[in-house]
Every structure is written in structure tokens, then in C-alpha cells.
């Protein structure tokens, strides 16, 4: 078994074209299976899978991919995580550890399904633990999406305000 890692040009500023070019390079260099991780690969993967029907694509943390007319691309296997379960456990554990003023800031890389699922699970877990302990819990819940996965000054200011206010 051999492999090669192809990274899109422009790092965290990569475009759909950059991602497609990385997939295309992998196929042109003989790849029979291309693994793509993250929802941001969707548009490039849609294009590459349609163009290379004899290549299998594994889409980690993504949804099934279709053509523009809605036809499923059978050479794409989508593997989705259940982030809501991890979020549920985090929310539940926080309340069971005695925290009653919680904050959740979802986002990073723009609006994305993984952060939404995690956030929904977090709130449900905190609610379940609050019911089990018969306590009131306050949750500050924000969907101020940053443009990248790094902490923006705006998000840092928001989180700092949460800490300042308890």
C-alpha cells in the first residue's frame, strides 16, 4: 500500500478550485482512491467525482455527494461523524461537574454542519444533566462564525466578555 498526501494550495485560504486541483493531481498521479476530509471539500469533490468516475473517493465528515441534477455519485463514500454525541457528553459533564453558567460558541470556517450538530448536542446534554440534578443552567450560545478555524479578535472579545460576566 502506498499513499501520497496532497494539500490544496493556499492553506487555510484554499478555494474550491485549489481543492479540486489537489484531487486532480492525485488522480493524474495514479491514485485509485482519494480521501477528502471536511465539509469544505464538497464542491471540489462533486466536480472531481463526476469527472473521474473510475476513481473512488472517501469523503470524511461529509454528506453524500450528488451531481447538479441530484443524481448520487456512486464513486463517493461519505463518512459522517455524530458530533452531537460528543457535544451531548460535554454539556452533560459540565453540568454534572457543577457548572451552571455555560457558554458555547460554534463556528470556525464559516457556518458548518459539524459545529451545529455539536452545539445542539451540548445544549441537550446540559439540559439533561440539569434535569437530573434539579438545577437551573444558563447557557450563552453563539453562532458568530469566524472565517477560519482560528480565533478571530471578535470571537476572542465575545468569549472574554462571557468570562468577565461569570
Residue ranges, per PLM feature:
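A residue-level marker of the well-folded mature domains of exported/periplasmic proteins
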Residues: 1-166
